[in-house]
Curated annotation (Swiss-Prot):
This is Multifunctional protein pyr-3. InterPro entries: Asp/Orn_carbamoyltranf_P-bd, Asp/Orn_carbamoylTrfase, Asp/Orn_carbamoylTrfase_sf, Asp_carbamoyltransf, Asp_carbamoyltransf_Asp/Orn-bd, ATP-grasp, ATP_grasp_subdomain_1, CarbamoylP_synth_lsu. Its main location: cytoplasm. Residues 228-413 form the Glutamine amidotransferase type-1 domain. It comes from Neurospora crassa (strain ATCC 24698 / 74-OR23-1A / CBS 708.71 / DSM 1257 / FGSC 987). The DHOase domain is defective. The third step of the de novo pyrimidine pathway, dihydroorotase (DHOase) is encoded by the pyr-6 gene which is both physically and genetically independent of the pyr-3 gene.
Length: 1832
């Protein structure tokens, strides 16, 4: 079998000259091709891999790598260039400062990708390639280094050779490599095994040389000379020398074979080095002699350790593939502590051969191999790892101190030479005694409550992990978390869940009630921490132990002053700052801090009054402004433009520390890290930068005493190594959720275990199952996190980003290159983003946008690059690191080049397509460049064999096998990591959290996955949101951390050969691609996507509701302002304006007047230009009701009804829900259930669905129906104790389940769900409720009645029950009247009431005591006792009830009203605010009833259970077939017979037919009936579809072949018809003569259906064409039809044109060759109807751009008098992807078929191509026609 050859796995560097290919051949015959970037020569050596993520300059100069070909597993190499070779070391004087020796020692370098000349670091003087060429070292990139690592891991270290491409043999497309027989193209050389040589002799010093320390620090011998270490150089790294010299000893470095017995020295050190210790007999003899003499202490490292062991008499062994990395855990046998070490070796000491007197000092925590030895009673020891690091962590550098101290002591006290070395850190026994396991039986975990900005789904993930960890340890867990939408509050996780506020009062109550032993405050974000801080002094008295990080540590990290002092005490620095209350004080403060500074007004919200000052003048100016707004200013050192770097650090109770992940913000300091793009691991830090910050992080966490996990953020000056600590979060944070997902290391799970006192080294790594958790993950991919903002939902919120967080969600993407990862992330944020390319959106000026970043920043960079800005110019404006900008510039340039090509240019260039995919461009983006469409590009790609590879995330960069299936897709690879045998069910997750789609859908996805797994199905999860539980690697059998779009889902589906795709659980994101998936041949599980489309397209849905007799509010679609105006006058204001297909009411608005209408239309039309705007009559004061249901095959099998507290008009996502409903009348409930049954049946739902109703005076109307799981599913499932998602999943998969199961909850009792808003985070947003959704989360609680439940739920959102003062401002008279009894109640309860002018008058008239407050301007301060603003600002008000009148549920207009100002003040000063009258009433009643709340079980509760649904839907086929209508027993000869009502009936029946066929129902409507088909012209489709239609209806068919019939004998048509009428009940006739219809009408006794009379008409084709348009586009009205081709003889066109006259707003464009125009009488028909828009002989882009339906016809040879005339026009029009680039993205391409050349085959793959679906619609239509004509 031929060995495998792999083509290059990544794209070549753009704009760099190609240096030729290199082929890396392995001993086993496999060959990897890549691009050369080092010296142009071939070499051979031993292949080894190294898993460190930084430190390539140090690694390649490490003598231990002599003769080896080094494979770096981290894919991005060369990012920070190479520092100067000339700079000399301060300590070592004549040696280079930045390297480990004076030359590169590796034989060759292999990497996945390479930065080229786009490196970025202040010390860099050249690229890595330049340096390698200087030194004559070959290098290659473009290799799938992960695949290579796995090969070495499985086979062991092997020989390899890097072979250069021969100069004279050029390769046409280097990126495709040289397939097949590659050898002739490359040079050949012999294999070389470096281990057979004496490598040490090559790298050791040639003559002894003495290095002296600085006299000031020199350590002295008792005799007065310097202490001297003799170093045996067997390949020493310079850093070992640096470690000695800086500690004040002099070092005599001697060659490897030097006999040092005559030298005078105080300690012997044996260095590291390359090769096999077996060949070093001379050195071993010399060391042996020193051991015998025992004159001095001895210390060895790496090879030195092996040589010392051999000298003592032990043996060494070759390891399979060596340990080469920076993350290897070694446990000390003395102290029991585990250290993270840097290693590089292929041999180890065999500990079983150690002679008497020697013992193991360190062992490898992963595989138990030896890592160090020591003599029991002599000062000799050695270690296998590198305590001097470089590259790698510096955690064991203390061993140099141990050695030097031992040497110093032995020079003063000889007897110590008879004792072993003393190591610091105590003994294992002492350490275990000091930090025992915490013994607890019951633990209380605090959750984070409702999701808000800054505290979102990541706490569901981390809390769930923590509970999992506690359960694994057998501990009983109690959780307090009112967030009912989360997985952690589901059954089966915590033993007990309290849906109560996470505040001090309720936590105290729960502790008293439950009496837990311990509490965790670190898994619930800031909410839980604050409670811990408030209760810290009570915990002991309550008998509760705080687990994990001590509360005092948390207080230190939360308080800036304390934290700064604490850091100062260990010599670390924070950002310098000082407060000042005058300009003079500020000027003094600056003397210490230094310019530039940032000035902020203290106590001002949202960064008001802050700015940067570079000099005194600017400072004075800023201070004057800030002091006007605030009594105090904070002056801080400005680090604008510094890099922001984060580390996640973990520490256990025994003081073992690791850093799990480091992250670099793409945006420099100044933007909140939650609003920054974050890249992990860091890309532009060198080894020294990385480990300087890592060491600091470890020191800080140790000093603070954190136990568990903590996050530390730094600012790093990009032009020096100056850094300062910004903050430490001593709890699980957003970053830690990201780090867990980025690395696969389950931080929260581990942190929960550490809090119990379990040490890290005793916890297994769940991914590899063989290594321990005390290690630092190695990544061989790059991760990009990107925030998602929804600022458009709020008026008056600035989109500028700064130090306060505004994003509501985030996405994470994974790739093998930065380009691939960032493009994926951009697409994940929003469906409309295609990737990094210029966007036409309305941005402010590019320069402003770059300087003052907003949520549009990345697009501004793309636009700037497109406009020709250089990287340097953009860097000046943004200070984003040039490395990132260069990568983006590469994408921008590539995109520019691609737009010059078309799809045809690319067809023969698979290398271009491959390169585009490797750079992360998606098919949609390429289609955009090449004027094609997504599916055509996909087809081209599949034909070229270009598909993504699946890679695993395993925490160890492939060093060990992984047992998880945590996967991502990449094109930068050459093989898959996994096999595809499962055929699992794909579940699509929720995607990015945003307003309207949040953690509820994650709950639904996870419940679906768990149900599938419990039922024995293999599962595949697809999601890209790092905050979710569904992206936890142990939830599904396979997790693809990938985007949910058509391309990716199809790729995964086809690779996995999945059983089906379940999209109903993830909210709107998966629903949007359901129909395209179905059309691409995917098995979509659950309700048919065509039915989903029926529910989401308002025309189809509305027609369906009319058909089944369910009411809906009056609405109309809108194309012009005048139409809209007329409609609004007809139905009367108010009305609701909204675009179709939106999530959570984007740009929906209630409109109260014509002026409003005009301004809103503009706004709504912008939202989604492809979908028209719709106006609906808005019903005031109606109740809104939510129905959540599950159906199977259209039959409802379970449902729950919840009622909204607020009236309709508040978005359902912002409404307060009550379950079971308390105020609904039985008749209303019955009507709702009846309507639900009808809708479920009409849509043939299988799975979950949700309907929103409004009810007024018992009349119900449907607002909308979502055929998917909805936001309220978790709430209703948990309140009622029936998991609707489990039921829905079983229904979808055809598993058995119980319909309407018994409800599992205490009798009585009410659940209330309340929205959680984040207005306080969004400076400027108006906190009123409207039709646009504004809440970011939800909470729920239970109570005896709705009042108790509501109050608890409200308190869960942070609401504080008022103590004394309540302020009222009520707008409308109606609200004043409605509120009066409630206000009276407040007064009776003893509250002091304040009110604004109108409200105060009204209340005084009704004898309610109230104090009047006025909204005063700033200058009227003297009247402060009447000033409302003063009362709010001084926190004198405990509750503000502000019921605005004019805005009536809509976002306010642009003037700033006083009401808005006071509402905003309430939010800014954290005063509870109520803005809805219904909320205000229920709140007052709740306060009156429940001043004090006790907790306990709910023993008694409400009285009625949901009604069982029964009975059938009343509308049936029989019903419409039995009514009188025009088709019954009648001929169907011409379309002119029919009215719009007839068509409506026909299509309604066709819909029913379609449902029946899809359900697989057997129909017998025409059983016993007979149809004859009589075709005098050829026909496949028409005859076959009539035959199929008849048979599906249960009838029989006689088909007459006219060429074999009596016609041949001269029988007339009338005789044939009469004859057939004797046998059949109806006849389908096609005849070349136009007059045949008259004959039929005159002579046939049974109905005749015209299937084409000459070139005149084809009615049934026209019917099915119209039906197709309705189904594809929702409606026929208002569409533009373009007919192309032979219009003269195209009979379907003639019929269709006649039918179009029934529809308003239709326009027609005619395109035909000369001589084939539409017949005059048909054309007249169009002119008369006013429908003719234009006529043309060419299909121009303008015509195409207006087209909604493109109807093509065949130029028919049989219609022409001569062959010549036919040939002249036959190829006039051809529709292909190139033509379609001008077409709308939502339109339909139709053709009556068969086709010749009119439509290219490539178009078949376009979603818009409807012609094959047209045939299917034709079947339903003809079934309907036959049923109507022949039944009854």
């Amino acid at each position: 079998m031929a060995a495998t050859v792999y083509r290059p796995a990544t794209a070549p560097i753009a704009d760099a000259p190609c240096e030729g290919l290199v082929c890396l051949e392995l001993e086993d015959g496999s060959a990897y091709q890549g691009y050369s970037f080092g010296a142009p020569k071939s070499i051979a050596g031993e292949l080894v891999f190294q898993t460190g993520m930084v430190g390539y300059p140090e690694s390649v100069t490490d003598p231990s790598y002599r003769g080896q070909i080094l494979v770096i597993t981290f894919p991005l190499v060369g990012n920070y260039g190479v520092p100067s070779r000339e700079t000399v070391d301060d300590l070592l004087k004549d040696l280079p400062a930045h390297f480990e020796s004076n030359q590169i020692h590796i034989a060759g370098l292999v990497t996945a990708s390479y930065a080229g000349e786009d490196f970025s670091h202040f010390l860099a003087t050249s690229s890595l390639g330049t340096w390698l060429k200087e030194q004559g070292i070959p290098a290659m990139y473009g290799v799938d280094t992960r695949a290579l690592t796995k090969r070495i891991r499985e086979k062991g270290s092997m020989l390899g050779r890097m072979l250069l491409q021969k100069e004279d043999l050029a390769v046409s497309a280097p990126s495709l490599g040289v397939p097949g027989d590659w050898k002739p193209h490359f040079e050949t050389i012999e294999w070389v095994n470096p281990n057979e040589k004496n490598l040490v002799a090559e790298v050791s010093i040639k003559e002894p040389k003495l290095y002296k320390p600085d006299e000031a620090t020199a350590l002295k011998h008792p005799s007065g000379r310097n202490l001297r270490i003799l170093c045996l150089d067997v390949g020493m790294k310079y850093n070992q020398l640096r470690c000695f010299i800086k500690r004040g000893v002099e070092v005599l470095v001697c060659p490897w074979d030097y006999d040092f017995s005559k030298e005078e020295y105080d300690g012997l050190f044996i260095s590291n080095g390359p090769g096999d210790p077996k060949v070093m007999d001379t050195t071993v003899e010399h060391i042996s002699a020193a051991l015998q003499k025992n004159n001095t202490p001895i210390f060895g490292i790496c090879l030195g350790h092996q040589l010392l062991a051999r000298a003592a008499g032990a043996k060494t062994v070759k390891l399979k593939f060596g340990n080469r990395g920076h993350n290897i855990p070694c446990t000390s046998m003395v102290t029991g502590k585990c250290h993270i070490t840097s290693q590089n070796h292929g041999y180890a000491v065999d500990a079983t051969t150690l002679p008497t007197g020697w013992q193991e000092l360190f062992i490898n925590a992963n595989d138990g191999s030896n890592e160090g030895i020591m003599h029991v009673d002599r000062p000799h020891f050695s270690v296998q790892f590198h305590p001097e690091s470089t590259p790698g962590p510096r955690d064991t550098e203390f061993l140099f101190d141990v050695f030097i101290q031992t040497v110093a002591k032995c020079t003063t006290d000889n007897t110590l030479l008879q004792k072993g070395v003393e190591f610091p850190g105590g003994t294992t026994e002492e350490n275990e005694r000091l930090h025992p396991r915490v013994d607890v039986k019951k633990v209380l975990v605090l959750g984070s409550g409702g999701l808000s900005i800054g505290q979102a789904g990541e706490f569901d993930y981390s809390g769930s992990q923590a509970i999992k960890a506690l359960k694994e340890e057998g501990i009983y867990t109690v959780l307090i978390n009112p967030n009912i939408a989360t997985i952690q509050t589901s059954k089966g996780l915590a033993d007990k869940v309290y849906f109560l506020p996470v505040n001090a009062e309720f936590v105290r109550k729960v502790i008293k009630y439950e009496q837990p032993d311990a509490i965790y405050c670190t898994f619930g974000g800031q909410t839980a921490l604050s409670v811990g801080i408030q209760l810290k002094d009570e915990f002991e008295a309550l008998g509760v132990k705080v687990l994990g990080t001590p509360i005092d540590t948390i207080i230190t990290t939360e308080d800036r002053e304390l934290f700064a002092r604490s850091m100062e005490s260990i010599g670390e620095k924070c950002a310098k700052s000082a407060s000042a209350s005058s300009v003079e004080e500020a000027l003094n403060a600056v003397k210490d801090i230094g310019y530039p500074v940032i000035v902020r007004a203290a106590y001002a919200l949202g960064g008001l009054g802050s700015g940067f000052a570079n000099n005194e003048a600017e400072l004075v100016d800023l201070c004057n402004k800030a002091l006007a707004a605030s009594p105090q200013v904070l002056v801080e050192r400005s680090m604008k433009g510094w890099k922001e770097i984060e580390y996640e650090v973990v520490r256990d109770a025994q003081d073992n520390c690791i850093t799990v992940c480091n992250m670099e913000n793409f945006d420099p300091l100044g933007i909140h890290t939650g609003d920054s793009i974050v890249v992990a691991p860091s890309q532009t830090l060198s080894d020294e930068d990385y480990n300087m910050l890592r060491t600091t992080a470890v020191n800080v966490i140790r000093h603070l005493g954190v136990v568990g996990e903590c996050n530390i953020q730094y600012a790093l000056n990009p032009f020096s190594r100056e850094y300062c600590i910004i903050e430490v979060n001593a709890r699980l944070s957003r970053s830690s959720a990201l780090a867990s997902k980025a690395t696969g290391y389950p931080l929260a799970f581990i942190a929960a275990k550490l809090g119990l006192g379990i040490p890290l080294k005793e916890i297994k790594n769940t991914v590899t199952k063989v290594t321990c958790a005390c290690f630092e993950p190695s990544l061989d991919y790059v991760v990009v996190k990107m925030p998602r903002w929804d600022l458009k939902k709020f008026t008056r919120v600035s989109t500028q980003l700064g130090s306060s967080m505004k994003s509501v969600g985030e996405v994470m993407s994974i790739g093998r290159t930065f380009e691939e990862a960032i493009q994926k992330a951009i697409r994940a944020i929003d469906f409309h983003n295609l990737g990094f390319s210029e966007s036409k959106g309305a941005l402010m000026s590019v320069d402003d946008e770059l300087q003052t970043p907003s949520d549009q920043r990345l697009f501004a960079i793309a636009n700037a690059m497109h406009a020709g800005y250089t990287v340097d110019r953009i860097w000046e404006l943004t200070k984003i690191d040039k490395w990132f900008l260069s990568k983006l510039k590469g994408l921008s340039n590539f995109a520019k080049d691609m737009t010059k090509l078309t799809a045809n240019d690319v067809v023969g260039r698979p290398d271009l397509l491959l390169r585009a995919k490797q750079l992360g461009f998606c098919d949609r983006q390429l289609a955009n460049f090449w004027d094609s469409n997504e599916l055509a590009i996909r087809r081209m790609r599949l034909e070229a064999g270009i598909t993504p590879f699946v890679k695993q995330i395993d925490t160890v960069a492939a060093e060990f096998p992984a047992f998880t299936n945590y996967l991502y897709l990449t094109y930068n690879a050459s093989e898959h990591d996994v096999s595809f045998e499962d055929r699992g069910v794909m579940v699509l997750g929720s995607g990015v959290y945003r307003i309207g789609s949040s953690v509820e859908f994650d709950w639904c996805s996870v419940r679906a996955i768990r149900t599938l797994r419990e039922s024995g199905f293999k599962t595949i999860m697809v999601n890209y949101n790092p905050e979710t539980v569904s992206t936890d690697y142990d939830e599904a059998d396979k997790l693809y951390f990938e985007n949910i779009n058509l391309e990716t889902v199809l790729d995964v589906y086809q690779m996995e050969d999945a059983t089906g795709v379940l999209g109903a659980m993830g909210g709107q994101t998966p629903n949007n691609i359901a129909l395209p998936l179905l059309r691409a041949g995917v098995r979509v599980l659950g309700t048919s996507p065509e039915m989903i489309d029926t529910a989401e397209n308002r025309y189809k849905f509305s027609r369906m509701l009319d058909r089944i007799g369910v009411d809906q509010p009056t609405w109309k679609e809108l194309t012009s302002f005048d139409e809209a105006k007329a409609f609004c006058q007809k139905v009367s204001y108010p009305v609701l304006v909204r675009p179709s297909y939106v999530l959570s009411g984007a740009a929906m608005n209630t409109v109260y007047s014509e002026a409003d209408l005009e301004s809103y239309l503009q706004q709504a039309a912008d939202v989604s230009p492809e979908h028209p705007v719709v106006i609906t009559k808005y019903i005031e004061n109606a109740k809104e009701i939510e129905m959540d249901a599950v159906a199977k095959d259209g039959k409802v099998v379970g449902h729950f009804i919840s009622e909204h507290v607020e009236n309709a008009g508040v978005h359902s996502g912002d409404a307060t829900l009550i379950l079971p409903p308390q105020d609904l009348e039985q008749t209303t409930i019955q009507r709702i259930e009846e309507a639900t049954r009808k809708i479920g049946a009409a849509l043939n739902v299988t799975g979950p669905f949700n309907i929103q109703f409004i009810a007024k005076d018992n009349d119900i109307k449907v607002i909308e129906c979502n055929v998917r799981a909805s936001r309220s599913f978790p709430f209703v499932s948990k309140v009622m104790g029936v998991d609707l998602i489990e039921m829905a999943t079983k229904a979808i998969m055809g598993l058995p389940f119980v319909e309407y199961p018994a409800i599992d909850r205490p009798s009585g009792g009410v659940g209330v769900k309340v929205p959680q808003f984040s207005f306080s985070r969004l400076s400027g947003a108006d906190p009123v409720l409207g039709v646009e959704m504004a809440s970011t989360g939800e909470v729920a609680s239970f109570g005896v009645d709705k009042y108790e439940a509501y109050l608890k739920a409200l308190m869960s959102t942070g609401f504080k029950v008022p103590k004394k003062n309540i302020l009222l401002s009520i707008g409308s008279y109606k609200d004043k009247k409605e509120m009066l009894p409630s206000v009276a109640k407040l007064s009776q309860m003893g509250y002091k009431l304040f009110a604004t002018a109108g409200t105060a008058d009204f209340l005084q008239e009704h004898d309610i005591p109230v104090q009047f407050l006025e909204v005063l301007a700033k200058e009227d301060d003297q009247k402060s006792e009447y000033s409302l603003t003063q009362h709010l600002a001084n926190n004198m008000i405990d509750l503000y009830i502000n019921l605005p009148s004019n805005n009536r549920y809509r976002r306010p207009a642009n003037y700033i009203s006083k009401g808005y100002q006071t509402r905003r003040m309430a939010v800014d000063y954290q005063i509870p605010l109520v803005t809805n009258v219904k909320n205000a009433k229920i709140l007052v009643e709740a306060i009156a009833r429940y001043r004090d709340m006790e907790i306990g079980e709910r023993d008694y509760q409400t009285s009625h259970t949901p009604l069982q649904l029964s009975g059938q839907v009343n509308f049936t086929l029989q019903d419409s077939l039995s009514r009188p209508h025009s088709f019954k027993k009648a001929h169907v000869l011409s379309v002119e017979q029919y009215t719009r009502a007839d068509l409506h009936l026909l299509f309604t029946v066709a819909e029913e037919m379609r449902l029946s066929v899809q359900r697989g129902n057997v129909m017998d409507i025409l059983k016993g009936r007979m149809l004859a088909t009589l075709f005098y012209e050829p026909s496949t489709r028409t005859s076959a579809s009539f035959e199929a239609a008849m048979k599906r209806l249960g009838g029989e068919v006689i088909s007459i072949a006219t060429q074999h019939s009596s016609v041949q004998k001269g029988e007339t048509l009338q005789d044939t018809l009469r004859t057939l009428a004797c046998y059949a009940d109806a006849i389908v006739l096609r005849h070349p003569d136009e007059t045949c219809v008259d004959v039929a009408k005159k002579y046939s006794p049974v109905p005749v259906v015209n299937a084409g009379n000459g070139s005149r008409e084809h009615p049934t084709q026209a019917f099915l064409d119209l039906f197709t348009v309705r189904e594809e586009l929702g409606t026929v009205q208002g569409l533009t039809f373009t007919f192309v081709g032979d219009l003269r003889y195209g009979r379907p066109v003639h019929s269709l044109v006649y039918l179009l006259r029934h529809y308003s707003g239709v326009k027609v464009q005619l395109v035909s060759p000369k001589g084939l125009e539409l017949p005059t009488d048909v054309r007249q028909q169009l002119v008369k109807a006013g429908q003719l828009l234009c006529e043309s002989e060419t299909l121009t882009p303008e015509i195409l751009g207006k087209t909604d339906v493109l109807y093509c016809t065949r130029v028919q040879k049989e219609r022409f008098p001569s062959e010549a005339e036919y040939e002249k026009v036959k190829g006039s029009y051809r529709i292909d992807n190139q033509t379609l680039k001008h077409a709308k993205s939502k339109m339909a391409i139709m053709h009556p078929l068969p086709r010749n050349e009119e439509i290219a085959e490539e178009v078949d793959f376009d979603q818009r191509a409807a012609y094959f679906r047209q045939m299917r619609y034709g079947l339903y239509c003809r079934m309907a026609l036959l049923a109507l004509v022949m039944s009854g």
